[in-house]
C-alpha cells in the first residue's frame, strides 16, 4: 500500500450517487441477467446454441461477474471512499470491472457483426456452420481480456490519503497514478484507440443493417414485425454503446491526463464528469438483457407468456374477489342478480 499525501480533487457527490445507483443496478441486473441465464438453460440445449446465442450467454456471464462486485463498491462509497475491506478485494473488484467493460464491448461487437453478415450476406451466412466459430471467438475474447486484467491482481491498487479533518488516513481503491507516468498514459491511449475502433465498426455495421432493411424491395421484405424487431435491435445496441460506453471513453483520457498532472486547469470538472460516466458505464448490465428480446424468438415468446400469465392471474384474482362480494349478502335481504355478462 502506497502513501499518497499529495493534493487530489474529489467529487463528494459520488458518496451519495454511487450507493444509490449501484444498489438499483445490482437488484435489477441480478434479476434480469439471472432470468436470461435461466431461460437459456431451460429453453436451449447447449449443443443447439448457435453463434449469436453463444455470444449472448457470454455477455450475460460478463455482466454477472461485475454485478457480484457491486456490494463491494457500495460499501466503499458509503464509507466516503475508504476501502475498509481486505486489500485483495480491491484488486478483484477492479479486475472484474475491467473484464466486464471490455468483454461487453467485444461481445456486443461480434453480435453486431453477426447481424451485419446475416443482412449483407444472407445466403452465405445461412450456409455457414457458426457454432464452432462462436465458441472459438468467445474463448479468444475471454483469454485476451482476462490475461490483460490479471495485471490488476498482481499489484496493490490501494493507497493512503489523509482524511477530511487531517486526523488520520483513509484507504483509496484504484484512485492513484504515479505523476507524469508515461506507461500509464500509453496504456490509456491504446485502450481508447481500441474502443473507438470497435465503436466505429459497430456504427458502420448498424448503418448498413438499417439501410438494407429500409431499402429492401417489397417482395423481399420479411413480415413487418420481424423487420421492426430487427430495427429495434440495432437501435438498442447503438443506444447501449452511446449511453454506457462512449461518454466514459470520451472523458477517460482527459481525466487520466489530469490525474497524471499533465492538465490541471479543468481537473475538478473532468473529475465530476468522470464519476457520472462511471455510473452510466455500469448501466450496461441492465440494458444488455433488453437486446435479447429482439434477438431471440423463444426468449420473446417465453417473456410474453409469463407476462400474459401474470396478467391473467391478476384478472382471475379480481374476478374471484368480485364473485365473492356478490355472493355474500345479509341473510335478511334478497340477493340482487348481477347484470354483468
From Swiss-Prot:
Localisation: Cell membrane
PANTHER family hit by this protein: P2Y PURINOCEPTOR-RELATED G-PROTEIN COUPLED RECEPTOR, PLATELET-ACTIVATING FACTOR RECEPTOR
Name of the protein this chain belongs to: Platelet-activating factor receptor
Residues in compartment: Cytoplasmic: 39-54, 114-133, 206-233, 296-341
Molecular functions (GO terms): lipopolysaccharide binding; lipopolysaccharide immune receptor activity; phospholipid binding; platelet activating factor receptor activity
Membrane topology annotation: Multi-pass membrane protein
Disulfide pattern: 90-173
PROSITE patterns xref list: G_PROTEIN_RECEP_F1_1, G_PROTEIN_RECEP_F1_2
Alphabetical UniProt keywords: Cell membrane, Chemotaxis, Disulfide bond, G-protein coupled receptor, Glycoprotein, Membrane, Receptor, Transducer, Transmembrane, Transmembrane helix
Organism, scientific name: Mus musculus
Gene: Ptafr
CDD domains: 7tmA_PAFR
GO biological process, one term: inositol trisphosphate biosynthetic process
Amino acid at each position: 500500500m502506497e502513501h499518497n499525501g499529495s493534493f487530489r480533487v474529489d467529487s463528494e457527490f459520488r458518496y451519495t450517487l454511487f450507493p444509490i445507483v449501484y444498489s438499483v443496478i445490482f437488484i435489477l441486473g441480478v434479476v434480469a441477467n439471472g432470468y436470461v441465464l435461466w431461460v437459456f438453460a431451460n429453453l436451449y440445449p447447449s449443443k443447439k446454441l448457435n453463434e449469436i446465442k453463444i455470444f449472448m450467454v457470454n455477455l450475460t456471464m460478463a455482466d454477472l461477474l461485475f454485478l457480484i462486485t457491486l456490494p463491494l463498491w457500495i460499501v466503499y462509497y458509503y464509507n466516503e471512499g475508504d476501502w475498509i475491506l481486505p486489500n485483495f478485494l480491491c484488486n478483484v473488484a477492479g479486475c472484474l470491472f475491467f473484464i466486464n467493460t471490455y468483454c461487453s464491448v467485444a461481445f456486443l461487437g461480434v453480435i453486431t457483426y453477426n447481424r451485419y453478415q446475416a443482412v449483407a450476406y444472407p445466403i452465405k451466412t445461412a450456409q455457414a456452420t457458426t457454432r464452432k466459430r462462436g465458441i472459438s471467438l468467445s474463448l479468444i475474447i475471454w483469454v485476451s481480456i482476462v490475461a490483460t486484467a490479471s495485471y490488476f491482481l498482481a499489484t496493490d491498487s490501494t493507497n493512503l490519503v489523509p482524511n477530511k479533518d487531517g486526523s488520520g488516513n483513509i484507504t483509496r481503491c484504484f484512485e492513484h497514478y504515479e505523476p507524469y507516468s508515461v506507461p500509464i498514459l500509453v496504456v490509456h491511449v491504446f485502450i481508447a484507440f481500441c474502443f473507438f475502433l470497435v465503436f466505429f465498426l459497430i456504427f458502420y455495421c448498424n448503418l448498413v443493417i438499417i439501410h438494407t432493411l429500409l431499402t429492401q424491395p417489397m417482395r423481399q421484405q420479411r413480415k413487418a414485425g420481424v423487420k421492426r424487431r430487427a430495427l429495434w435491435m440495432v437501435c438498442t445496441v447503438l443506444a447501449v454503446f452511446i449511453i454506457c460506453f462512449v461518454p466514459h471513453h470520451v472523458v477517460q483520457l482527459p481525466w487520466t491526463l489530469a490525474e497524471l498532472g499533465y492538465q490541471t486547469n479543468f481537473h475538478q470538472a473532468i473529475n465530476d464528469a468522470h464519476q457520472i460516466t462511471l455510473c452510466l458505464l455500469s448501466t450496461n448490465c441492465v440494458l444488455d438483457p433488453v437486446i435479447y428480446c429482439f434477438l431471440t424468438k423463444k426468449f420473446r415468446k417465453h417473456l410474453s407468456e409469463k407476462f400474459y400469465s401474470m396478467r391473467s392471474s391478476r384478472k382471475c384474482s379480481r374476478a374471484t374477489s368480485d364473485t365473492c362480494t356478490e355472493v355474500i349478502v345479509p341473510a335478511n335481504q334478497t340477493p340482487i342478480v348481477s347484470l354483468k355478462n
